[in-house]
Amino acid sequence: MQDVPPKGAVVTDYDRRHMTQYMRLLDAAGEGASWQEAARIILGLDTQKEPERARLVHDTHLERARWLSSVGYRQLAAGHTN
């Protein structure tokens, strides 16, 4: 997993490969899980050894997940590929 997911208004192959993690991040956020717990369990990151990196990876992927769930899903539903 990259530290920062792709940006932009197009669903990428990277997004497709990490869809499960994106959905799990959304679920964790909705359930009130701490970012540390989500980063450790869902993303497999060591929040003790690399707290800044773990926070960056978590926050940027959660942001991308939110975009996918509010906008990007339309591309998936329409069958768009890049």
Regions found by a protein language model. Give the residues of each.
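Long, charge-rich, low-complexity intrinsically disordered regions
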Residues: A77-N82
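Major-groove recognition helix of helix-turn-helix-like DNA-binding domains
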Residues: R24-L25, Q48-G72
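Short helix/strand-capping connector loops at secondary-structure junctions
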Residues: V4, R40-R53
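Short, amphipathic alpha-helical "recognition" segments used to contact nucleic acids or chromatin
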Residues: D15-E31
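Short, charged amphipathic recognition helices of the HTH superfamily
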Residues: E31-I41
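Residue-level signal for alpha-helical context at structural boundaries
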Residues: L43, L56-V57, L76
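Short, Lys/Arg-enriched N-terminal segment that forms or immediately precedes the first helix
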Residues: M1-D13
